[in-house]
C-alpha cells in the first residue's frame, strides 16, 4: 500500500513528533493534546488518484464536540475530495529513533462536508460525517494576529509521512502568492 510507503518521505526539517529538544512536544501535556488533534488526510481527487494532506480537529465552542476539521484549500478544491475523505489518526512513530509504521493508528472513514474555503488564504473548513475515535483531541484556536518574535509550532504529515513537528519564531507577516511564484 503506497500510503504506508510514504513513511520517511518528508524533509529533514520536519522532526519526528516523538523527538525534539528537552522541552519538545511530549514533555508538555497541553502540546501532546494539540498533536492528538492532527490527522493524516487521505482522499480521492476527481481524476481518480489518491492525495494526502494534513488536518486539525478544532473546537468551535467550549463543550462542543462538532467534528470540524481545518485543512488547506489546495487539498479540498471541491466537495468531492471531502466526500471521499479518510482520516488516519495516531499515525505517529513509536519512538524518536523509529521510522517504523505504527500498528495502532486508526483510519476514520465516512467522509466530510466541505463547509468553506479560501484560495487567497489557503484554508478549508470541513465537518466530519462521523465522530472521531476515542483519544483524538479537539484543538483550540485564536484568530488574533501573531506578533513578531513569538514561538510557533506545527504538527503535520508532510508528504504523507508519520506525524512531524516543526517549530520556529515569527518574524512579521509575509504574503505569498503561489500562483505567480517561479515554477508555479
Predicted features and spans:
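Serine endopeptidase catalytic core focused on the charge-relay Asp
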Residues: 1-184
